[in-house]
Amino acid sequence: MDIILKLSDELDVAKWQVEAAVNLIDEGNTIPFISRYRKEATGSLNDEQLRKLFERLTYLRNLEEKKAQVINSIAEQGKLTDELRAEIEAAETQVAVDDLYRPYRPKRKTRASVAKEKGLEPLANIILLQQETEDIKVIAKQYIDAEKGVKTAKEAVQGALDIIAEVISDNAQYRKDIRDLTFRLGKITSVAKKPEEKTVYDNYYSYEEDIVKIAGHRILAVNRGEAEKILTVKVVAPEDLILGYLERHIIVGQNSNTEPFVRLAIQDSYARLIAPSIETEVRNMLTEKAEDGAISVFGKNLVQLLMQPPIANKVVLGWDPAFRTGCKLAVVDGTGKVLDTTVIYPTAPTTPQKIAQAKTTLVKLITKYKVEIISLGNGTASRESEQIIVELLKETGLPVQYIIVNEAGASVYSASKLATEEFPNFDVGQRSAASIARRLQDPLAELVKIDPKSIGVGQYQHDMNQKKLGQTLEGVVEDCVNKVGVDLNTASAPLLTYISGINGSIAKNIVAYREKHGKFTEREQLLNVDKLGAKAYEQCAGFLRISDGTNPLDATSVHPESYDATLAFMKKQGIKPSSIGKLAGLSKIIKNYPKLASELGIGELTLRDIVAELEKPARDPRDEMPKPILRSDVLEMKDLKEGMILKGTVRNVIDFGVFVDIGVHQDGLVHISQLNSKKFVKHPLEVVKVGDIVDVKVMSVDLDKKRISLTMKI
């Protein structure tokens, strides 16, 4: 298989682009580095394209390795033919290779292998050849052998049929066609083990759907119901069609001596060998496809969460709500430094005195540190805490706003080794409150400290392939961190770990170097960091910024390898280093990019990136994202009325709809059918993404079930 050509066709990009990208990956370059600094080589392939390419490249290389192993194994058995080799080499999936290898794979003891040991293979061949005119039962008597365990002609025939059944089951073409028939015409069914018990799987108690139509989230739902022993799930294949297909391909002519036996072997082969394994394969393939879709959605949601615009340079009070153990508070300054922590008890079990004390404490903190925003976690006791905040603001008139932030993962972080190292003198509640405050100030810098799987913007994330989920989300975080870039002198080790070319060990060494030698004043000093060699420097330098260093270019995304060309360009244009960042409109006055790039010895795309950086150094792509909604009053779920139009924030996007925070502590659902009135929506991500500010209308409110139905068809 020509892997380069295959990838070119699959990804719909030119062969030379794929070739260049593969070479760059094989040379040890990271995806963010290739995407940002090797645009000429790859024809501007972006992060998403490069990650898909890398994923498929890995799969296809593993496939080629597997083919080689299979060919060697069959050759060692002396059974490899030119035709079989060609079929294996042409296979495009691991399933296809498995089908071809099945007859030659070393098997555990089976009914067929036992029959072969009893010397019944010649009888099986006679029946399968379907040319015998003599009664098979008479011929079978010749194979009676008490020593081998064949006591009767009936046992001999049964053993022969077991061999034929396995031969049929091992036929690669039959398996492929039966699998295809099952996919095209089969159904998934589920029934409740205990129909009288009410569960969240009510919709699947008597459920049936065509395999070709079933949505990924329903596959994951029935899988979970099955895992929890609530549902029995089956694949119902078009059995009559499949048996008819096998009979047409296996039965030759109309030999009344052999045909009944061949039919029996076909039926047994399908029922005992083919159907169970095809059902498993179909379920696995459906699950894999559903998981891939869910992981993709999770990744897209995570991008939006990580890329939320920071609310920088604001003093924030982080509030981790709770009942019995009290609400933990942490005040952080505009740089994220913790100024103060405390615990208040305004929520149940409480007293008027404790509520008054809590409000007094809040007023003192707000006035002492000039708190501008309260960042309230959305966990247990959040509703009650919000009520206290609103009462306080109304009573005092303090110029403070509040926002409810998703605290998912805060408790995981607060109990982690990393949090202990960062806040050795704080308890888990204080750490959690500080994290809730900081994730408002700079969501990206704070959320990278948490396992992406714990952030909670997806569906069924705990049920799927954790390795694949982890790899995808790590890639998402890496892409986001490198798109934004980091300040070399303030970035934490967890944040630095996601920078291109830097691993956990090097990240810690950078922080240690900074603590020992003081601030970095130029990028080249990175080469003095332990274990950070020339290759790592090449990969990371452009993503690390020094805002007040000796070289103004170190504050930009211009890579050090392009400094000479950049300085030559600046000289040609009469630009002084002090003018960097004050060159609005520079890109418009350059008349001939190709000619100028050629003169400078760089590519045109690189030159355009350099010009953009000189105009606006280290631009933050998060600035273009919707700003979070700050509130000063509370709305209760009971206040909602049908027809009300509200502004909300998209919290989560899943296959069947969108969850929107409208400020009532219970996210409302906009079903996929309610997203757009002008066109059919195949997936919600076509319309909205996490973090979007949207206008919604209340369709219905169920206070008992705590369900809010919303529509965007306004």
Please describe what each predicted stretch is.
Residues 1-19, 26:
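Generic start-of-chain signal for non-secretory N-termini
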Residues 49-52, 59, 63-318, 322-425, ...:
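Duplex nucleic acid-engaging cores and interfaces of nucleic-acid transaction enzymes
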Residues 55, 61-79, 89, 421-519, ...:
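Long, highly charged, low-complexity intrinsically disordered interaction regions
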Residues 180-188, 319-323, 379-384, 405-412, ...:
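A glycine-rich phosphate-binding loop feature that marks nucleotide/adenosyl-phosphate handling sites
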Residues 546-714:
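Single-stranded RNA-binding regions, centering on S1/OB-family and related RNA-binding modules
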